[in-house]
């Protein structure tokens, strides 16, 4: 049994009667990979005497393990050559239309071997881990053909079994229409619905299905067909929605009872109302707006005020958010979206867990949940986002085991 002691525990719990927006002084008992007890005040001497290990985190803050609910983890290559285009004022869609953007990464991902893609993803997961992430969603969508989509999803499965971070796998063939279907989007939609999605489901390679509902990518009508087909096959649903143009993607996500609608920089007031009513989680990606040098951020405060559950994620990908550090999204949420530290922490713990259907097992410090914990070298939650630009993680614990400490990996497979 391991006993954690701290004068700043932010539990992210949603239990009635608990002030979930404040940290408290207390203790956490961990045994067999699970949280056995959470208490306020001093730990009883009986617990201290029974503990095999006592982690004294006084002067530091303990949170639940961070959950990155939106990543494009498995991909080939990088796109630093596009930075000059962005600095020259080229938009995301202009770069995409010129053969760059997603298609650049599709070519690199198709050309890379399974071993190369796996090693690249493992390196990224290690970076995520030392910055506090203990669970991550991972989308395909840089293959767009049967072979490469399956390859990337098989890598997700391998990563989930061979790295401390738990991986939640998402099929996202509807990321773009590939070159071989350039003038035949309808043919590509049929290919996904009739061939790829059934094969992915048969092999058990993805829990969720996602699609990019955007001008010149997939229309609302096309996206709805894809989502209905995915739901009929038994996939849970996610949606890239209202990222650049307000197409009523959020309303579609709510209509389809999707677990999450993601991006949402161009969401309408009606879209916000729809998400609040449906319970669909808004997964917001402030690091993406930052990297794209955009002045437009999703209206996070308004969403929260209207009752939308808001999560925050990195959107880790080579084109619009090349960072594995979820703390970057936290800082951007504070300084660009004006969210409070408690709102931010809930966004990367319990709300993010809801976005990937894991709220019953992770995302908060509660009895019976998985013992995924992060100890931050911060005396309180305000300091955690106030002291920006550094890795504030002191220790990362996964299922009750120490896996990273002071920027170093200490896990053993």
Swiss-Prot record:
Gene Ontology cellular component annotations, sorted alphabetically: cytoplasm
Enzyme Commission number(s) of this protein: 3.5.2.7
Binding of Zn(2+), residues: 70, 72, 240, 315
The name this protein goes by in its record: Imidazolonepropionase
Swiss-Prot/TrEMBL catalytic activity: 4-imidazolone-5-propanoate + H2O = N-formimidoyl-L-glutamate
UniProt keyword terms in alphabetical order: Cytoplasm, Histidine metabolism, Hydrolase, Iron, Metal-binding, Zinc
Origin organism lineage: Bacteria, Pseudomonadati, Spirochaetota, Spirochaetia, Spirochaetales
List of residues binding 4-imidazolone-5-propanoate: 79, 142, 175, 243, 320
Names of required cofactors: Zn(2+); Fe(3+)
Annotated source species: Treponema denticola (strain ATCC 35405 / DSM 14222 / CIP 103919 / JCM 8153 / KCTC 15104)
Gene assigned in the entry: hutI
Pfam family membership, one: Amidohydro_1
């Amino acid at each position: 049994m391991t006993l954690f002691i701290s004068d700043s525990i932010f539990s992210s719990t949603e239990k009635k009667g608990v002030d979930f927006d404040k940290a408290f002084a207390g203790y956490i008992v961990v045994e067999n990979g699970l949280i056995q007890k959470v208490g306020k005040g001093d730990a009883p001497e009986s617990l201290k005497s029974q503990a095999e290990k006592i982690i004294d985190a006084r002067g530091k803050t303990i949170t639940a393990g961070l959950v990155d609910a939106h990543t494009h983890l498995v991909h080939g290559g990088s796109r630093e050559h596009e930075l000059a285009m962005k600095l020259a004022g080229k938009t995301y869609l202009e770069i995409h239309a010129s053969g760059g953007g997603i298609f650049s990464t599709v070519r690199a991902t198709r050309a890379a071997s399974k071993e190369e893609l796996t090693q690249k993803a493992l390196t990224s997961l290690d970076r995520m881990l030392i910055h506090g992430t203990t669970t991550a969603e991972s989308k395909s969508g840089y293959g767009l053909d049967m072979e490469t989509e399956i390859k990337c999803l098989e890598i997700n499965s391998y990563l989930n079994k061979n790295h401390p971070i738990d991986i939640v796998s998402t099929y996202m063939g509807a990321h773009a229409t590939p070159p071989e279907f350039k003038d035949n989007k309808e043919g590509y939609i049929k290919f996904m619905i009739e061939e790829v999605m059934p094969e992915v489901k048969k092999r058990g390679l993805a829990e969720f299905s996602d699609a990019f509902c955007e001008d010149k990518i997939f229309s609302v009508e096309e996206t709805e067909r894809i989502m209905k087909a995915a739901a009929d096959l038994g996939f849970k649903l996610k949606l890239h929605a209202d990222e650049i143009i307000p197409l009523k993607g959020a309303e579609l996500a709510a209509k389809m009872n999707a677990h999450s609608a993601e991006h949402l920089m161009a969401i309408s007031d009606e879209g916000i109302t729809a998400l609040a009513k449906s319970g669909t989680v808004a997964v917001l990606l402030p690091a993406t707006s930052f990297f794209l040098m955009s002045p437009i951020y999703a209206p996070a405060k308004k969403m929260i005020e209207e009752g939308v559950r808001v999560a925050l994620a990195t959107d880790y990908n080579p084109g619009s958010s090349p960072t594995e550090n979820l703390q970057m999204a936290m800082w951007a949420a504070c300084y660009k979206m004006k969210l409070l530290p408690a709102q931010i922490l809930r966004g990367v713990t319990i709300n993010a867990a809801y976005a990937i259907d894991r709220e019953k097992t992770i995302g908060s410090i509660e009895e019976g949940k998985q013992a995924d914990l992060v100890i931050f070298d911060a005396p309180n939650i305000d300091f955690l986002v106030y002291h920006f630009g550094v890795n504030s993680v002191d220790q990362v614990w996964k299922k009750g085991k120490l896996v990273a400490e002071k920027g170093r990996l200490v896990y053993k497979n």
